[in-house]
Amino acid sequence: MRKLSSYIGRYWYGYVFAVASMVTAIALDMLYPKITQKIVDDVILGGQMEILTKLLTGIVLVGIGRSIFGYCKEFTFDFLSSKIGAEMRKDLFNHIQTLSMRYFDDTNTGELMARVKDDVDKIQNALGYVGMLLIEVTIHVVFVLYCMFSLNWKMAFLPVTVMLCCAVVAIIMERKLDKVYEDISEENAVLTTVAEENLAGVRTVKAFAREDYEIKKFLSHNERYYNLNITQSKVLVRYYPLFQFVGKVLPVAITILGGISVMNGNMSLGALVAYVEYSRNCTWPMEMMGWLTNDLSSAVASYKKIKKIYEVKPEIEDSRNVVTLDHVSGNVEFDHVSFKLDGKQILSDISFSVKEGKTLGIMGATGSGKSSIINMLHRFYDTTEGSVRLDGVDIRKISLRQLRRSVAVVLQDVFLFSDTIEENIKMGNRSTMQMDEIKSAAASAQASSFIEKMDEQYETVIGERGVGLSGGQKQRISIARALSKHSPILVMDDSTSALDMETEHEIQKTLNSLKDTTKIIIAHRISAVCHADEIIYLPVSYTHLTLPTT
């Protein structure tokens, strides 16, 4: 993972400009009490009315300059934090895309959504408005204390002592909030997961009349999320009033001490007025400490969560000595392949080969590992023992990009994106595919008949996961997507189960016409594989039998 410093370092010049604008704005702020001191001592008490116009003009000019540099400061911090947030989100999403399937087997989608969106937002906020205030508070305090020591060094020890006490309280508060925010971040991910699963499966929920159960499940997590936020609020309200109290009392205490000095002749009235103004400039940083500590603790917890994702390395990667095939013919061989997942034996000593242009049918009982063969061929997982070869080369030596571009797959669990039918079909070859090729693929998959009856035809936007389409329609679009890829290997995982016999027969005719394409067809129905050159059967004993075909 790139450190935060590397993101900030990219835009160091922007931060230098922002901090320089901030320093200038704060320096101008420090002039107000000085001008006020002059007005009291020289104009009101000294009767020098001739300088009043200059002093008032100075106040106006200082105000204009303060506004200009304040705008530059805030705009630059907001702009830079937005840029860094976008880059962090992009890098995190890119890293997630590189992770192996095993990681997604063990991680909820809602958790990843929370990390990419909510946690990056909190870090972005810390690098923007919150970070700006933290730097501003620090510089402001330094400038104010310098001015206060210049006016009366003895009285300056009072605000210094108070600020040190507030800093200690802020550290204690941060430590208490740190664990709470980690729990809040975890529960936010769980809550997002529950909501995402429920909304994605709303038809199943309604079909089984499980609305009440799902509501109770959501409310239980919502209540825990609420309780954690209340715990955070209790910590905040326990300490935050202290900062506010000190902020209100400090100017009063300085006024009393300064008044005594004025009466004793040790300080002018104008100097006292200026000193009180400076003390008020001390109070807002102290009042901000509680709020800043709260937001920074939240950002730190989010950073830790994101860091954990970056600590996960992909299990499936390109080998150091990648082999690039000049041409992929489509010869597939499984050589004594065994596969275990989480200690469970899925495949055991599986061997078969499919020559270029031939068709292999795979049948078997539920749970016998038929779909795991697809996982092996795509290198979603690596074999525990044995090897899978493509054109005689172990697929572990072939680049993942070339391997997966060489295999088109129609998965059992059809997933269509919330986009147009056109975009869903040309997903595998998006950059070069023309409309006539899209229509040809749809016709080959027997999908053009229902697509062209729609009002928008190929521009029809389908819902998430193909909501609004029948199971057979979704399967046909998925088949069209695979055919449009024109890969040398085509794998179909029980992908005609929702089709009627006539449509299935037409698709089989299309598959038979693909003479140069190696086809692996996984099915439960014998009708789906009856035209295969060879059929293997996978019983639950993890090995296979070869069935004769005619």
Regions found by a protein language model. Name each.
Residues 10, 14-27, 57-58, 62-65, ...:
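Transmembrane helices of ABC transporter permease
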Residues 319, 325-545:
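ABC-type nucleotide-binding domain
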Residues 23-34, 63-71, 123-126, 130-142, ...:
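Hydrophobic alpha-helical transmembrane bundles that constitute the permease/transmembrane domains
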Residues 1-29, 36, 44-56, 65, ...:
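Membrane-integrated ABC transporters
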Residues 546-550:
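A short, hydrophobic C-terminal helix/tail in secreted or cell-surface proteins
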Residues 101-102, 118-127, 131, 135, ...:
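An intracellular "coupling" helix at the cytosolic face of ABC transporter transmembrane type-1 domains
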Residues 45-46, 82, 90-114, 118-120, ...:
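Short intracellular "coupling" helices and adjacent cytoplasmic loop segments at the cytosolic face
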Residues 48-50, 54, 147-161, 231-304, ...:
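Helix-loop-helix
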